[in-house]
């Protein structure tokens, strides 16, 4: 538009169109289509953070990956999410513009969410897993990253450039929609996950399906404003321009003669440049546009050097969604009668960031400066990095208290053995090979022990067959020798019962579902001819064990008046069935290694804490016959227990039971995670928000979009660091892992402080003759643009 037409142009955005200063004027001139962009962002952030909140537990529980590999996949997904914005920026700025980039990639994004939701319907172990899951996540990662640099910038495009007050208000609304979407979804989606659907104990199809629906809604909401949007056509991509300049400089430096030296290697790109022939230089009245551009790139490199600690910050920060969630699974989630799901703790960060930002701006920073300490940007970042490291030290200390409740896991060359004595009135003195003998007392009662006995360890390179001698002084108690065959890297339970001794492999582990459950298994050493006569669905001879199902039904009292009313198969959280049974060889005491009877060992199931009675039940779950036993009561989550049921003697139909604690229940409250979240969020305010401000203000106006892309890419690098470290499988202890990450962060911040003191000087663009209006893109993760 020529200068002669400026005063005749009545359209908004021309110099005569003054920025409104009153609320009435702002409302009148506000571009109404921006509300659709804000609504789109709200739905998209709900979609992304809702899916991401439950992702680690989905890897762990449904895809059955290890904790370490689940963490690797979570961070690999984040790498994709924060690498792909570069592609979205190139596509939008250089080819099809922001509007069409958002539209096409949103459809692609929604397809990924739908594919992930569809794949999660298949049961664990299905051939659909994990190919469809990972394909869906790849599409989601490319989609969310592709639109990330476009949506907020597209919203800013709807305003005249000089409407700075309205643009600021828009980004405040945009920022609020980001945090509102993430806050709501991170609280609700774990609840969706904890429901039951499609025959599963969890409902990941709902947890992924609702975000998929919200992504479809986000796309439709965005397209609803198509007719009214201001669509800025694509222009030269500044990222390509910078890369081209650097490439040209390196190429010309390599081919230049030794007599033709430049003061800086970037200045070689000026070879062949003639200001007299450049339109840009003419418009700057003698100033060389290309030389000033080269100076801007030099400053950019100085900013990049100061961004060295940023990837390490994200390497720590993003472990909220992986390592910290898995830590919460091993903690007591009951708080004042309510239950907090482990993947809901991330809500604390989303809430605290909204609370801390005004507190730091209005109270913390002014107070510190009144004490005579100037809060420069680099000082804030150094303080934030230190706080981030401290949060990981706190997390490591919490983990030290969690560790004693973790299961004993045998090494690759080790076998573990736990011996359970259920024989009434018999205590034993046990001698294993040439080890020191120890006393084995009889267990009485069905109530589980409050503590877990450390298993006996055998070490070697091959199978173990220890000679275990059981001796006693009682005349009616057996004296015998057991020689179980034990495999390395396996845990076993050896059970002494009135019918003989038996041993079987067990897998000590905490419940993985993250729904406040415990794990209960069963060894049943009851011959079929000793079960009640009304259990007609099992026909066998006297030596065979009962192989039908056992129901655990939640009861409120010890008195049972109607079996079928106690057991309601439709009652969620009150009815469970042990049905996956394997034969259990029962060896005779007097005949070495001779199998004289058979029992059944039932694989453990996850169930809610409470008081339960045991019932024989048929396949249709319509008939229930109680075992004449006291109820089993356990009010704590996170433990693993083994119930052993046997007859009182070989010729007796009366049954007795004991319960062994194989894995301790969760003893450390999940509330102990609050300090690490508080400290990390404070570090985020100091480091991340200030770091964004530093990177944005220290770059020249025309290179701010490059800095935006680099800022996003630091997140990808940070998560890649986590992926590499976990792939190396260095840590076996989460506490050590947290301390090491915190220590690395402190070292990086120490280097950063040295750079800030001896290397960096703040840039000054106040005398720039060219004013470029750039809109800051607010990232969806509080501070990433």
From Swiss-Prot:
Q: Cellular component per GO?
A: apical plasma membrane; plasma membrane
Q: Which residues are glycosylated?
A: 467
Output one GO BP term. protein transport
Q: Where are the transmembrane segments?
A: 46-66, 72-92, 99-119, 134-154, 167-187, 208-228, 303-323, 345-365, 382-402, 670-690, 711-731, 738-758
State the Gene Ontology terms under molecular function: dipeptide transmembrane transporter activity
Q: Name one Pfam family in it.
A: PTR2
Does Protein biosynthesis show up as a keyword for this record?
Answer: no
State where the protein is found.
Membrane
Principal cellular location given in the protein's record: membrane
- Coiled-coil regions listed in the entry: none
- Tissues and organs where the protein is expressed, per its UniProt entry: Expressed in vulval, pharyngeal and anal muscles.
Q: Which UniProt keywords apply?
A: Glycoprotein, Membrane, Peptide transport, Protein transport, Transmembrane, Transmembrane helix, Transport
Annotated function: Proton-dependent uptake of di- or tripeptides, and to a minor extent tetrapeptides. Transport is independent of sodium and chloride ions. Protein shows high affinity to peptide substrates.
The protein's name is Peptide transporter family 2
